[in-house]
């Protein structure tokens, strides 16, 4: 890889790492050929992946790994345990080169029901394809041991390694061991338990291991109650602990669920008119063993249904999926042989769909953040396009102007106009207005005066007009602005921002008669509108306070006879406020304006 390419890759990876979510999940490192070279788990994806690229985290093997990374993928999950299980499944599937080099390839244990005449049940870390049944893997060892212990207490099973073939048993080759004498084994080795009876127990054990433990749970609960009734509290407590563990075992996770087998899960998230993101999860034997999110660039304004259909065909072909059930978020017009489409409303399937949606939304957000960092103008364009779409504007709102009034019972009435260009404050274009024609507290008349003055002047000076006017208020404010637009024969869209009782932006109004526009709170667009409203309020109220303060200062000194403008200016320059002049000693005031005037000032302020 040449130096320029290395620099591009480095910047690309930095962009991904800086936008990783601070959530549990797994991450995958890919080389330049697109091969997964490492899979890892993390409680906090951003912190963990960042550690590989920090200078202090550079042992030899890690340096080699980091030098090979050309791309990073990740999957968000809901818990650390889910991340452990998913990491294990993906390592087994992809066998990444650097997982072997960098860490012990830990295999989570499973429970094996051995394929033999009298099957043994035991934990193992090795999967041998000899017809035996395997259940797991288990990331939580206590749960696994609780299940094994439960099985041990419910069913007498052999634990020996003897070859219990019918011929060997008939030949009398074996003797019972200690397990028989302590009633842990029924003695099939000497013919004391038939294969039929033994296999009946094995069939029930397999049901437990599949997660069908409701009946066993009921038995444990009953046993716990019986022991408590017999005042055997210590034994009851032990059974209670087992009951709690089996109940924990029964609770299913989003990543591993013993009742879900061979299912595909798809979700989609659009990015305006440009593209759509699709997430694909493949569930095999209750575990996620495929996860992929990809982007479709729209060419012919395709619908979500059309894009999702394309995505389903593409992913099933790419991953050779033969799943007979596909979970989707909405109805789509597609028929596949022997395939059922499900839109889940509750339960484990609903959780899987939510997990897929979580991943596709996170992927979309991360892609947008990366793009906006590379091109800051892109964020502004996206927000302006959103406003255009939500309000059905004819053109992009490149310039937005917002008005607000401020007064206290009609005194010191002022107004302000803030200007946002390309979704950013343009402070050099902000304007303050003293209300000239309105007497008393009349917000509507004040708004009308200021809007008329601003746009009358803009017309006369041929200044650029805004693409959208926003009022800091509801329907009444919008109506007076509309009247001015009609009077000046201007066609500028008008929106209103209403506040709740706590003076927080609560809704966006548009149209005549004004209608509430459903913009999701806390979305980037809503935050922009909230910023505009907060900014015009701040600007107006600051101007109002300044004006009120100057009036109060002026009136206090103006009422003192014999004090001219030069004296007032000198005092305010030194002491900054009337309050400080009043608090100063006569000597301090005399040093500025002389003793005789100082006495007049002090007496005048004391009597004010």
UniProtKB/Swiss-Prot annotation:
Q: Which residues form the GIY-YIG domain?
A: 22-100
Q: Which SUPFAM superfamilies match?
A: C-terminal UvrC-binding domain of UvrB (SSF46600), GIY-YIG endonuclease (SSF82771), RuvA domain 2-like (SSF47781)
| GO terms of molecular function | DNA binding; excinuclease ABC activity
Question: Residue ranges of the UVR domain?
Answer: 214-249
Physiological role: The UvrABC repair system catalyzes the recognition and processing of DNA lesions. UvrC both incises the 5' and 3' sides of the lesion. The N-terminal half is responsible for the 3' incision and the C-terminal half is responsible for the 5' incision.
Tell me the compartments it is located in: Cytoplasm
Q: Taxonomically, which superkingdom?
A: Bacteria
Q: InterPro entries from the xrefs?
A: GIY-YIG_endonuc, GIY-YIG_endonuc_sf, GIY-YIG_UvrC_Cho, RuvA_2-like, UVR_dom_sf, UvrABC_protein_C, UvrC, UvrC_RNase_H_dom
GO terms under cellular component: cytoplasm; excinuclease repair complex
Q: Does the keyword Aminoacyl-tRNA synthetase apply?
A: no
**Keyword tags:** Cytoplasm, DNA damage, DNA excision, DNA repair, Excision nuclease, SOS response
Q: What quaternary arrangement does the UniProt entry report?
A: Interacts with UvrB in an incision complex.
By sequence similarity, the record places it as follows: Belongs to the UvrC family.
Q: Which GO terms describe its biological process?
A: nucleotide-excision repair; SOS response
Q: In the record, what lineage is assigned to the organism producing the protein?
A: Bacteria, Pseudomonadati, Bacteroidota, Bacteroidia, Bacteroidales
Q: What is this protein called?
A: UvrABC system protein C
One Pfam family matching this protein: UvrC_RNaseH
Question: Where this protein primarily resides, as one coarse class?
Answer: cytoplasm
Q: Which PROSITE patterns match?
A: GIY_YIG, UVRC
Instruction: Tell me the disulfide pairings in this chain.
Output: none
